[in-house]
Amino acid sequence: MIDIHSHIVFDVDDGSKTLEQSIKYLKEAKKVGVNKVVCTPHMSRDNKEKALKIVKNFKELKKEADKIGVELYVGTEIMYKENTLKLLKGRKITTLNNSKYLLVEFKRGENRNFENIINALNDFLDNGYIPILAHPEFYINYRNIDNYRKLKENGVLLQIDGTSLINKSSFKTRRFAKKLIKERLVDFVASDTHCTKKRDYKSLKKAYDKVKKIDKNYANIIFCENQLEIVGEIWKDQL
C-alpha cells in the first residue's frame, strides 16, 4: 500500500511529536504492508520558519525510514484560503512530491455554499493543478452524494480516511464514506495518521481488507495504484 496523507513528520503540526514516535508508526506501516508514505504536514500560509523545520525534520526522519524500508516523500495538506493559489504559484507551499497533485481541505463546520468549494477547486484545475479533496466524509454540511459527483465530473479527486471505513469514526461518517465507496467516487484511501491509536496504520490495513472483500480490483486501485501517479512508479500487486 501507498499512503498519500500522513502527519508523521515530527514536531511540525498536530501529528507526531517526536522522532521516536514517528519511527514507531513507520515500523507499524511496514508491518502491515505500507512501503511508501507521502508526508503531508498542515500548511496554509507563507511561513518560512515552519517550512525550513519541516524540511529539516523530514530529512532526519527519512534516514530512519530508509533503515526500516519505507520510502518517504514530501508534501503538505493545505487548508484552503483565498490566497492559496498565489502561494502555490510562488512556491511558498508545496504539492505532493512536487507533482501537479495537491491535497487540500476546507474548514469543517463552516456553513459555506458548496458552489464556493467547487469554484475554489476549479481554480486549481484551471491553473494546471489536480486537487485531491481530503476526507470529504467529514464535511457534515455537505453529505450529499451529488456534490461529489459534480466535483468528480470536473476532475477533482477524492481521498477518504481508512478510519472512516471501520469502527473508529461516527456512524454517519462511516455511512457516507461507504456510500462514496459504493458509488466508486473514491480515488484514494489514506491513513491521515497523526501517530495515535485512533488514526494508525493498522486501521488502514483493516480498511483495505474491508474494501478487498467487496472488490479486490477497486481496493488495489484506491489503496495502491492511483497513488503511483504521485510517487511516479509502476505498481506490482504485492498484497
Predicted features by range, described:
Residues 1-69, 198:
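An N-terminally biased module of ancient metal coordination in phosphate/nucleic-acid-related enzymes
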Residues 7-9, 42-43, 75-81, 107-109, ...:
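Active-site beta-loop-alpha junctions enriched in small/polar residues
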Residues 30, 125, 181-182:
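Non-catalytic positions within long, well-ordered alpha-helices that form the structural scaffold/packing
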Residues 48-159:
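Extended substrate/RNA-proximal surfaces in nucleic-acid metabolism proteins
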Residues 1-3, 37, 101, 131, ...:
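Hydrophobic "anchor" residues on beta-strands that sit immediately upstream
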Residues 209-239:
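Mid-to-C-terminal alpha-helical segments outside catalytic/metal-binding sites
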Residues 185-201:
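Short acidic/histidine-rich active-site segments
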Residues 18-26, 84-89, 114-117, 176-177:
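Short, acidic/polar
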